[in-house]
Amino acid sequence: YTTERMTKSYANALLANIALTRAGWMIRESAKAGYETAEYSDATYPTQRCDEATRKSLYERALKHLSAVITSNRHHLNPSFENEWYLINQRILDQTYRENLFEIPMGIEESSELGYTIGVRCNGQTTQYGHNSSGKQKLTAPYLWSFRDNDQRRDITCANFDIREENGTTVEKLLGNNPFGIYVGKWDIRKMSEENINLAANTLGDTKWMSGINCVRMRYSQVLLMYAEVMNELAGPTGSYEGSAGISAKAALAEVHNRAFSITTAEESYLNSVSTDRTTFFNAIVDENAWELAGEGFRKYDLIRWNLLVEKILQFKSDYLKQMNGAYQRTIYFNYLDAAHTQIDMSSITYKGLPAGKSTSDYHASVSSWGNERTTSTKTQSETNLPSISSGLVGSTQQGSGNGAAVKN
């Protein structure tokens, strides 16, 4: 058994995903009778989904396949989200938990730009890790800000720093006021094998190096989130349904959510608060999907089938403006892990202000942050960069109007 080959588990999970996609919203060449039309929809090419009875049948089909994966007992969550991504970076197939249902196999020096085009950025040549990497895929300040306190996924997913050379030493540099340029930290040169680090170190100039890191196409956490979604549609957050895996939607969501916290007491209260009705619980699934899967290539397509892509882009823009003018810190403080001040203690960064009992003298360094723009005359981030993001889809104004923008009926 190897996750580098398509297995029955992956086939079941993929069929469930196809059923959910079929039950979701999609753009059509022309309106189809009996289908529901979305609020955000083009008059010529409407966004529609199938009728309620058909959706229920598709949810039941998805439930069948997801339950097959869960009850097979072949796959489990790695108890450590950090170790899950350490193993991926190390190119080690996990034979203990098998959280990854399927990975497209890659070859070092032959294929995969994970860690080069996507991942923590090396900003120029470094003595420790070699040459420059591009880190093209970016996350945003509102996304980093959205994580609940003590969620271990935040600092693994959001790399608000780059690696560079200063005075002959490789150092980590906090990015400062760069709210739309946070790198995806799941692929991280610091966690890769010596073979990969040596490959990068011996690659000259701007030449790409191929990491050989497998492309994971389905994780068990995705199975649990899809299961939670389906069970919520069929039975609500806590109900049971024939053909299920014997766990509720809430229990499936809790398994994914609680894995990210060393202490889950406060999270039980959160899970209870979002399990009061179908709509609230669905919104919690949408949030969990973002916290768990960002950067992996799935979120956009889930938002499309939920018809939330436009809404979430507009929400991100609104959240940024609100927080930039309010909650974002003008300056953030942080400590280093080592005496040479080369490695940042990510858990020390004061994104949400100084902790009780702490003063600025308790920190090694500081940088200007996302809230700094509210007191500057030049507002590059809010007035130039923000309007350009997804402007072809939502327009260049906060209200989502303008050429190319989706229109709410």
For the regions a language model picked out, list residue spans one by one.
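Elongated scaffold/linker segments in the mid-to-C-terminal portions of large proteins
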Residues: 2-3, 65, 75-235, 306-409
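C-terminal beta-barrel architecture of Gram-negative outer-membrane proteins
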Residues: 260-271
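Conserved small-residue hinge/capping positions at short loops/turns
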Residues: 292-295
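Extended amphipathic alpha-helical segments with heptad-repeat/coiled-coil character used for oligomerization
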Residues: 301-303
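Short alpha-helical linear motifs
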Residues: 34-36, 274, 307, 328
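Alpha-helix-centered segments that form part of catalytic cores
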Residues: 256
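Structured, solvent-exposed acidic/aromatic patches
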Residues: 1-116, 207-220, 233-251, 263, ...
